[in-house]
Design a protein with these regions (language model features):
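Short N-terminal edge-element motif at the start of the domain
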Residues: 168-181
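Glycine-rich phosphate/pyrophosphate-binding beta-alpha loops
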Residues: 173, 191-202
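C-terminal helical cap and adjacent loop that interface with cofactors, partners, or active-site loops
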Residues: 128, 198-332
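Predominantly a Rossmann-like dinucleotide-binding segment in NAD(P)-dependent oxidoreductases
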Residues: 39, 46-170
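Aromatic/hydrophobic pocket-lining residues that form π-stacking "cages" and hydrophobic walls in ligand
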Residues: 1, 29, 55, 297-298
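Beta-strand-loop-alpha-helix segment that lines the small-molecule cofactor/substrate pocket
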Residues: 1-48, 62
């Protein structure tokens, strides 16, 4: 669909996550965008989450020192999304596919046939912006591991019994998929995909540098020589308020009724403002391809016995010369 839009002459294309299934899908989108001199922006709204943008502001002001390690992921119990009774969107049964409703009609099939990080962009997008991926830095190599798979089968048996047809399905997706990425500038990234087991929602963010770190799971920050107590966490609230991103300060009222806590306003605002101003989008086709391709690459790594594989350079070397553009001010 993205390529179809580009071939139809559309110069600004907004895409849901993700932009392709195979690695070649991603290359085709990149080549098409370059051929038609068009902008492709994957509308990854978590890049605009308020705490995430405050942390980005802190990173850019040097509060954490030189960034060393980052973590993120998609940690969300989706069992009652992958199965339902065909009448309710969430839960009340263990049907999927043609007998399911909403996401259960398609999402569960991925867990049957694929084994990799199936939804990486919520986690990787925000932390990629913290270390200027594709703009002075890039992903160098990737390696993934998948745990055994038990969660979906156990869920089906508990709700539908061991004789239900869904209990006979062999699920391929590991309950926990862990991906490690090395970057050209020396940072390491850890991503986790965790959707088949009981747990509260979390994207598992961690941004750590030579002077301190932030972890969203415990909503805490520690900055050396600035924390209230040595070796003890500060509640992140005061830090996040102090370093609230200028974009949020300016547009918070307009975002009140937008989806996902206001994030949707900001990502759409950025896309539309880029069109109006006839300028490049703050997240472009190279970002979309790099973040989205993690799925295909993680599948490949797992299939090869957890082999470390080279990460493709979708910019064809231009990452060395491109400058950061994401949310540098309060405009968009």
């Amino acid at each position: 669909m993205i390529i179809g839009c580009l071939e139809a002459g559309i110069k600004y294309v907004g895409s849901e996550v993700i932009i392709g299934i195979t690695l070649e899908d991603h290359w085709e989108v990149v080549r098409a965008a370059e051929k038609h001199k068009a902008e492709v922006m994957m509308l990854e709204n978590v890049c605009y989450r308020r705490d995430v943008m405050a942390i980005l502001n802190m990173v850019r002001q040097g509060l954490f020192g030189e960034i060393i390690h980052l973590q993120g992921g998609y940690q969300h119990d989706l069992r009652d999304v992958k199965f339902n009774d065909g009448k309710h969107v969430h839960g009340f049964g263990v049907e999927f596919g043609a007998k399911g409703l909403s996401e259960a009609r398609w999402r569960t099939e991925h867990a049957i046939h694929r084994n990799g990080d199936l939804y990486p962009t919520h986690g990787i997008g925000p932390i990629a912006n913290c270390i200027n991926i594709n703009r002075g830095n890039r992903f160098k190599s990737i390696c993934s591991f998948a745990s055994k798979t038990r969660g979906l089968h156990d869920y089906v048996v508990k709700l539908g019994g061991e004789n239900h047809p869904s209990a006979k399905v062999n699920f391929k997706l590991g309950d926990i998929v862990t991906t490690s990425i090395n970057c050209m500038n020396g940072e390491t990234i850890l991503l986790q995909h965790d959707t088949n087991l009981p747990r509260p929602y979390s994207l598992g963010f961690r941004v750590q540098g030579t002077e301190g770190l932030w972890m969203d799971v415990n909503n805490s920050i520690y900055v050396e020589n600035k924390a209230a107590k040595v070796h003890q966490w500060d509640d992140a609230k005061d830090w996040l308020e102090k370093y609230d991103h200028p974009l949020w300060k300016r547009w918070v009222k307009e975002s009140v009724d937008a989806g996902h806590g206001g994030m949707d306003f900001f990502v759409l605002h950025s896309f539309i403002e880029s069109i109006k101003r006839k300028t490049s989008t703050p997240m472009d086709v190279y970002d979309a391809a790099s973040w989205s391709a993690i799925t295909a690459l993680s599948e490949q790594s797992i299939e090869l016995g957890n082999q470390t594989i080279d990460f493709p350079d979708f910019t064809n070397g231009q990452w060395m010369y491109r400058k950061p553009v994401f949310c540098l001010n309060d405009e968009f």
